[in-house]
Amino acid sequence: MHLNRRQFLGGGLAGASLVLAACGNRSSTGPTSSVAPTPKPIRQPGSLPWPDLPAGSDQVPEIEHIVVVMMENHSFDNVLGLIGRGDGFTVGSDGRPTATNPDGHGNDVHAFHMPTDCQTTGVRNDWTAGHEAYDGGTNQGFVTSSTAEAMGYFTRDDLPFTCGMASVFPIADRYFCSAIAQTDPNRRYLISGTSLGLIDDSFPLDLPPNGVIYEQFDKHGITWRDYYSSAPTLGVYLPYLEEGNPLSKGVAKIDQFYADAAAGHLPAYCLVEPDYNRSSEEDPQDIQFGDQFLGGVVNAVMSSPNWPTTMLIWT
């Protein structure tokens, strides 16, 4: 893909402007008050983001299409810790990260550049290991809950496309998973705002009490698609994929995404999914396959007639 810096920045402007608009202007000369601000009411499930406006009101008219790509199981430092932006690694005088984790035997394991494109020992991401790694907020349990490979990281040489994009576009260095758990609980959160209390990849017996976001889209006439390579996220609630369920019509193979992007027919919202057996970056997959997949998706979006009014989010 050949895009210059001006094109990159132009594409990122819509997303960046949303952040700036939300922050507003800061003044050091304005009036002050000792009166504490009125606390905002606690948001409840099903509450509206703009309570004074009808449900489904468009508050971002500059953006007509939102494309979401959700990859697998890598931390900010693991992928972007050395790009020089955001809250990444602290680097010593030798240019290497200073981060360490104890191994449980009195030794410190230092962060190191992965010698291969695959984390072959499979850094654990289950509920128990995740909370052991979190270690009450100290993040000192990654090695003892998995192996020393948990301290491995990748660089621009390993992930040229990912790091190249992160060097230009806005990045979220304080974005955390909804549940310190495996894939399916977090994908349930993505489409329904809950994991139904499940902490593993088992299938729930019940549907989410407030439904999934796609049902709200249909209710308000907002177009959507779940474009999948090997399995759709909608399948974390199997009944939605059953023949006759209206949501099953919103699921399409990945080839349809590329066709829709090229034709300028992207829906208002779409989830674009990797092959979970090859290009999702799940351990022990070769991460370069994931980097290539992301390159293909971004290239398709940026080449689309829809691009001037599109926001792409990947995590």
Task: Pin down the residues of each PLM region.
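N-terminal pro-sequences and low-complexity stem/linker regions of secreted or lumenal proteins
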Residues: 2, 9-19, 24-315
